[in-house]
């Protein structure tokens, strides 16, 4: 099986897993992966839970549609990430409930939507900035994310959800899951008296994670 065929299968497998476990619903969300001669990306308005590998769109490095169904309307956003971060080999975007709710309720900080609650959030995710609301597919989002792609592993789109990039489709999905579960934890606990003041890991713990695991915090 060729690398492209394997990536098509992986995109569909990871998409189905995310859908079945409630990280996205309906036809929301998209996944892409880097190829030597372009990218694969899920089709526009496709349900991540029921995709055909042959229908996954192939796009050339110049952005032209090569094969498969029509590419996602967020193609420009995915391309901005790949063009500005050579280590990014996959991008996953979902409309995950707790992360969208977080943008409605108010994020922790604009440059860090969540505090460093757990060691695995610090190790696997790191800083996640908020991108103010724009309509789906707005070029302004791609332009903003292009400036951040090499600095962070993801962003949170206001009212739309997370966009996460990593070295593989599975690693991007794992990071997105860690991000969503941390948002769930924060949304569950943040109104508990005294919690917000002691929620973040102390500076010493963050230094230890940076030294031991090269954590980005």
From Swiss-Prot:
<feature type="binding site">
    <location>
        <position position="93"/>
    </location>
    <ligand>
        <name>Zn(2+)</name>
    </ligand>
</feature>
<comment type="function">
    <text>Catalyzes the decarboxylation of 3-oxo-tetronate 4-phosphate to dihydroxyacetone phosphate (DHAP) and CO(2).</text>
</comment>
<comment type="similarity">
    <text>Belongs to the aldolase class II family. AraD/FucA subfamily.</text>
</comment>
<keyword id="KW-0862">Zinc</keyword>
<dbReference type="InterPro" id="IPR050197">
    <property type="entry name" value="Aldolase_class_II_sugar_metab"/>
</dbReference>
<dbReference type="GO" id="GO:0005829">
    <property type="term" value="C:cytosol"/>
</dbReference>
<feature type="binding site">
    <location>
        <position position="95"/>
    </location>
    <ligand>
        <name>Zn(2+)</name>
    </ligand>
</feature>
<dbReference type="InterPro" id="IPR050013">
    <property type="entry name" value="OtnC"/>
</dbReference>
<dbReference type="InterPro" id="IPR001303">
    <property type="entry name" value="Aldolase_II/adducin_N"/>
</dbReference>
<dbReference type="GO" id="GO:0019323">
    <property type="term" value="P:pentose catabolic process"/>
</dbReference>
<keyword id="KW-0479">Metal-binding</keyword>
<dbReference type="InterPro" id="IPR036409">
    <property type="entry name" value="Aldolase_II/adducin_N_sf"/>
</dbReference>
<dbReference type="GO" id="GO:0046872">
    <property type="term" value="F:metal ion binding"/>
</dbReference>
<keyword id="KW-0456">Lyase</keyword>
<dbReference type="GO" id="GO:0016832">
    <property type="term" value="F:aldehyde-lyase activity"/>
</dbReference>
<dbReference type="Pfam" id="PF00596">
    <property type="entry name" value="Aldolase_II"/>
</dbReference>
<keyword id="KW-0119">Carbohydrate metabolism</keyword>
<protein>
    <recommendedName>
        <fullName>3-oxo-tetronate 4-phosphate decarboxylase</fullName>
        <ecNumber>4.1.1.104</ecNumber>
    </recommendedName>
</protein>
<feature type="active site" description="Proton donor">
    <location>
        <position position="120"/>
    </location>
</feature>
